[in-house]
Amino acid sequence: SRRRLLLDYLNQKGAACGYINLGGNVLCLGAKPDGSSYNIGIQRPFDDEGAAMLAVSVTDQTVVSSGVYERYFEVDGKRYHHILDTATGYPYDNGLLGVSIITDESVDGDGLSTTCFALGLADGMALVESLDNTEAVFITEDYELHFSSGMGTKIPYQVME
């Protein structure tokens, strides 16, 4: 995978830990130099880019997010985002604002975040629950957070005020 190639390259160069932010894809290599986990913010939709809705604590994992707030335009007060339903050609309108996937492989997270968004909350969550070493946070239009079963136990998190 691309993540494995990047990690191999960083290891060859002597990197034991690191943090790489590729927009909606954050890769954490190992733990921080002090041994603690990285705290990765998950953006509050339609807020300033730096405003986090929650933070997840990860070590040697990736956090990948997809959402309607990343790329969109408005016409007559209606937002049109970039995640399109292939059956209609229009943006999905399924009650979701965003999905964040926490997994060991960046390439898995990238595909899963968009797939889970397209599936919607119930089916997307069912898919995540069927996968090993994969957790998720879904944000619905009412700004409610929906967590997969391993969130809080396998992946610590903190909701921001």
Residue spans of the language-model regions?
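Mature catalytic core of soluble alpha/beta enzymes
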Residues: 1-161
